[in-house]
Swiss-Prot record:
Disulphide bridges: none
Keywords assigned by UniProt, alphabetized: Ribonucleoprotein, Ribosomal protein
One Pfam family per UniProt: Ribosomal_L13
GO CC, any one term: cytosolic large ribosomal subunit
Assembly, per entry: Part of the 50S ribosomal subunit.
Transmembrane segments: none
Family, per entry: Belongs to the universal ribosomal protein uL13 family.
Gene3D superfamilies: Ribosomal protein L13
Name of this protein: Large ribosomal subunit protein uL13
C-alpha cells in the first residue's frame, strides 16, 4: 500500500462533509494533512451548536474525572480529528488509519507550496442558513485563544 500525501484546505468547508471525504481518503491508505482547521464551518445557529458541544460538560461521575468521564474536544485540531475519527472503522485498522491524519491551525511553512485540495460539495456556498467556524466554537468552549 503506497502512502500518498494529500493536503486538504479546510477554509470555508463544512466540517461534516469534509470529514466524510477525509475518511474515504484514509480508508484508501493515503496520508491526509488538514490545514486551516480553525476556519472550517459547522452549520446551524451559533447558540444551538455551542449548546450541543457544551452539553456533555455537565455530565458528572463519582469516579476519578481524569479517568472515567466523557472527554469533549475543545481545540480546533481536536474537534476536526474527533469528527473524522467517528467516521472511521471502530477496530484496529481504523486506529491505524487515524494515525495517518494530521491537522494544523493555519498553514505550516512546509505545506505552503504543496497543492491543496478542496471539496466542492463541502463548500460553504451550499449553506443558506447560519453557521459558526470551528475557531469561534473553540473560543466559546474555552480551548482556543489566538
Amino acid at each position: 500500500m503506497s502512502e500518498q500525501l494529500v493536503v486538504v484546505n479546510a477554509e470555508n468547508q463544512i466540517l461534516g462533509r469534509m470529514a466524510t471525504h477525509i475518511a474515504k481518503l484514509l480508508i484508501q491508505g493515503k496520508r491526509v494533512v488538514v490545514v486551516n482547521a480553525e476556519k472550517a464551518i459547522i452549520s446551524g445557529p451559533r447558540a444551538r451548536v455551542v449548546r450541543g458541544y457544551s452539553l456533555i460538560f455537565s455530565v458528572r461521575k463519582f469516579q476519578n474525572p481524569e479517568k472515567n468521564t466523557i472527554k469533549r474536544p475543545r481545540t480546533p485540531i481536536n474537534i476536526v480529528k474527533r469528527t473524522v475519527r467517528g467516521m472511521l472503522p471502530k477496530n484496529k485498522s481504523g486506529k491505524m488509519m487515524f494515525k495517518n491524519l494530521i491537522v494544523f491551525i493555519g498553514i505550516p511553512a512546509e505545506y505552503k507550496d504543496k497543492q491543496m485540495i478542496r471539496f466542492e460539495d463541502a463548500d460553504v456556498k451550499r449553506l443558506k442558513g447560519k453557521y459558526i467556524t470551528v475557531g469561534e466554537l473553540s473560543k466559546l468552549l474555552g480551548g482556543f485563544s489566538q
